[in-house]
Amino acid sequence: MKSIAIIGASGYTGAQITSLINADENLMIQGLYVSENSLDKGKPLSDLYPSYSHISLSLSPLCDDAKMLIVEQADAVVLATDHAVSLHLAAWFYQKGLTVFDLSGAYRFSDVEQYPKWYGFNHEYQDVLSDAVYGLAEWNSEQIASSKMIAVPGCYPTASLTALKPIGMFLTDAFPVINAVSGVTGAGRKAQLHTSFCEVSLTPYGVLGHRHQPEIATQLGQEVIFTPHLGNFKRGILATITVQLKPESTEADVAAAYAVYDDAPLITVKQNQFPKVDDVVNTPNCHLGWKFDPETHYLVVASAIDNLMKGAASQAHQCIRIHFNY
């Protein structure tokens, strides 16, 4: 049985991964941690999330003694923390010999030049960054199994890349256009005016400047036009993607490309049928639906996931299972 420490357990993603690990008979939770300055330190997790009343663990402050205890007792650490916090914590635990599963964006780019623009900091851990692998579970399982530094993908990139990677060989130079809508849990647990009950509404944000755009482009190997939207629902993502395929591409080619997921238990693919968010909420699944126009060679593919599950916590759990080979 592997022991896992969870840092940032008070947030939506941290609480979700706590629930998944708690239910996994092959894993045990070494401890749940929050910042020393957190107002939630010392509280039982169930005080914040009554639905987790079966998890009798409290949130401990991540002091220096706690960090050393993690090194002594845990096999791996899950970081559900802010990018700038994960930057340092991931490197520290990695250098102490633990396997790190980082849910932030601090290790998703291999190029250090990307970080000042997209994350607002200079990346000072090139040695750790060079060992990091991108944890897109269905595509990078061999790397996840062998690495001790796993950067779990963002929610929008997970939905988009799962849809686009199978057809990469058929893409033209035209940029895929990705329009995606996420539930408000994607904005985090802290109170914000634009996510409050009376203010939240369907609206685009981060237009031509969202940090998930270069993440998608890097992993796809092609630039994309990505426009995220905030939806007035709690959780889930629906990404609708329009791409033009090469002139010689056929409907049979597309069907054959998506057959790569035939043995992927969490991915469902349907032709001429499109997914809805309600079918994937509270599950680790991704539902894909596609339609191809043989005259224009345009393909429209829709991808639905739960942003807190397949877009974060359950994909981290997948990576843990892949890494520890069970």
From Swiss-Prot:
Signal peptide: none annotated. It is an enzyme of class 1 (oxidoreductase). The keyword NADP applies. It catalyses: N-acetyl-L-glutamate 5-semialdehyde + phosphate + NADP(+) = N-acetyl-L-glutamyl 5-phosphate + NADPH + H(+). Its EC number is 1.2.1.38. SUPFAM superfamilies: Glyceraldehyde-3-phosphate dehydrogenase-like, C-terminal domain, NAD(P)-binding Rossmann-fold domains. SMART domains: Semialdhyde_dh (SM00859). GO terms for cellular component: cytoplasm. GO terms for molecular function: N-acetyl-gamma-glutamyl-phosphate reductase activity; NAD binding; NADP+ binding. One of its GO terms (biological process) is L-arginine biosynthetic process. It is found in: Cytoplasm. The active site is at residue 155. It comes from the Bacteria. Pathway: Amino-acid biosynthesis; L-arginine biosynthesis; N(2)-acetyl-L-ornithine from L-glutamate: step 3/4. Its main location: cytoplasm. Keywords: Amino-acid biosynthesis, Arginine biosynthesis, Cytoplasm, NADP, Oxidoreductase. InterPro entries: AGPR_AS, AGPR_type-1, NAD(P)-bd_dom_sf, NAGSA_dehydrogenase, Semialdehyde_DH_NAD-bd. Catalyzes the NADPH-dependent reduction of N-acetyl-5-glutamyl phosphate to yield N-acetyl-L-glutamate 5-semialdehyde. PANTHER family: N-ACETYL-GAMMA-GLUTAMYL-PHOSPHATE REDUCTASE, CHLOROPLASTIC-RELATED, N-ACETYL-GAMMA-GLUTAMYL-PHOSPHATE REDUCTASE, CHLOROPLASTIC-RELATED-RELATED. Belongs to the NAGSA dehydrogenase family. Type 1 subfamily. This is N-acetyl-gamma-glutamyl-phosphate reductase.
